Amino acid sequence: MQLNSTEISELIKQRIAQFNVVSEAHNEGTIVSVSDGVIRIHGLAECMQGEMISLPGNRYAIALNLERDSVGAVVMGPYADLAEGMKVKCTGRILEVPVGRGLLGRVVNTLGAPIDGKGPLENDGFSAVEAIAPGVIERQSVDQPVQTGYKSVDAMIPIGRGQRELIIGDRQTGKTALAIDAIINQRDSGIKCVYVAIGQKASTISNVVRKLEEHGALANTIVVVATASESAALQYLAPYAGCAMGEYFRDRGEDALIVYDDLSKQAVAYRQISLLLRRPPGREAFPGDVFYLHSRLLERAARVNAEYVEAFTKGEVKGKTGSLTALPIIETQAGDVSAFVPTNVISITDGQIFLETNLFNAGIRPAVNPGISVSRVGGAAQTKIMKKLSGGIRTALAQYRELAAFSQFASDLDDATRKQLDHGQKVTELLKQKQYAPMSVAQQSLVLFAAERGYLADVELAKIGSFEAALLAYVDRDHAPLMQEINQSGGYNDEIEGKLKGILDSFKATQSW
């Protein structure tokens, strides 16, 4: 078969008409320098602040410095094989992490990838790590409690849902223990928890995860990990990633609790990044925006009103408020709370729990110093019974501290002073609590009632612990319905007062401690 020239030219014209060129524009640049996880890129003309930049080897960097002729970015992951001259591309996306109920019970890294060997995540979607905090109109006042299970905290420094309460103290004073016990105490409360470990040893984090699992609290907890061996960029971003995971529950009308352990290490990681990016250093060599580093993170912890939740869920959830409660941890050096980062975080948060080395070494654990620990908004969230019974405890301890200092110089003391000193010592002993042994509202209320109404007056100081243990065993055995009623209602009236008095009178008669 022969084709003439006309047919050939027609076929060629048809093929040309059908030919479709799909052009794909890439904003591409070249690495001009690599140093300690920070790369400088030339040629990225349309790069956003915080944008993900695609690197060779399925890795990403985040653009932090946008300069006239170059972009400074931090690499998320290993950077030893990156070299000058390598091509990189803008992605047009801000960093996002997986969020949803499928993350509960899982251990993930800063980027949301599972590291617990339990298979892939079943996430509900993705959320940007950087988000704007809810506005003033979208918030609701804090009036519901978060029970930590610690007598000294729930009585004197109460925490409310949507509050930011700082845990501050030197190393080895029980900061992490307090936060982990608060998470364990939420296993039956319906509050979802997020634990963010920043710059810690992998063995320490493994121990925390094991303890959460042993006490049945891992099932409603997400653990976000950026170990000490990971890059400064991942340590800097870990709290924001954890916050995005917690906001998923807040925005859907649920309650969540997030622990940042600890923000001192995040500030150090951010200082390292900033100095490598050649940003001008300020006080203690921190960059000028280190206050904003923590304020934009902690302002995202809030209680949002029902209108906000309804608008966010497009009407699916109605009449429910959501909350994200934050427990940031700060490590001080030799008890110096006037250093740069501690003062910043104290001014941002709604109160602080100050843990003291001297108290810890004296066996008073949790080592809470009630004198300078404060909760600025939690009082409104306390249950009625705790509010009624805790006032006397704080006063007794304040008077005891004052008299204890004075009595060191006075040889002879009158009976009233001796009684106050004795009462203060017994209350201090009563507030001691073992780790991983959180107490219910009813148990705390009963113990505080015993202290306030003078039932400890004839109990020896050395037997306060056994008195408490025997009392709790007695009520669990013989008065469980009353304990259940107090736990559910949190109310306080003459009837409940009479019942508590009756329980203590009958228990004291047994002399079983």
Swiss-Prot record:
The record marks S373 as: Required for activity. One of its GO terms (cellular component) is plasma membrane. SUPFAM superfamilies: C-terminal domain of alpha and beta subunits of F1 ATP synthase, N-terminal domain of alpha and beta subunits of F1 ATP synthase, P-loop containing nucleoside triphosphate hydrolases. Coiled coil: none annotated. Signal peptide: none annotated. It is found in: Cell inner membrane. It is a peripheral membrane protein. It catalyses: ATP + H2O + 4 H(+)(in) = ADP + phosphate + 5 H(+)(out). It is an enzyme of class 7 (translocase). One of its GO terms (molecular function) is ADP binding. Its main location: membrane. Keywords: ATP synthesis, ATP-binding, Cell inner membrane, Cell membrane, CF(1), Hydrogen ion transport, Ion transport, Membrane, Nucleotide-binding, Translocase, Transport. Belongs to the ATPase alpha/beta chains family. Produces ATP from ADP in the presence of a proton gradient across the membrane. The alpha chain is a regulatory subunit. F-type ATPases have 2 components, CF(1) - the catalytic core - and CF(0) - the membrane proton channel. CF(1) has five subunits: alpha(3), beta(3), gamma(1), delta(1), epsilon(1). CF(0) has three main subunits: a(1), b(2) and c(9-12). The alpha and beta chains form an alternating ring which encloses part of the gamma chain. CF(1) is attached to CF(0) by a central stalk formed by the gamma and epsilon chains, while a peripheral stalk is formed by the delta and b chains. This is ATP synthase subunit alpha. It comes from Klebsiella pneumoniae subsp. pneumoniae (strain ATCC 700721 / MGH 78578).
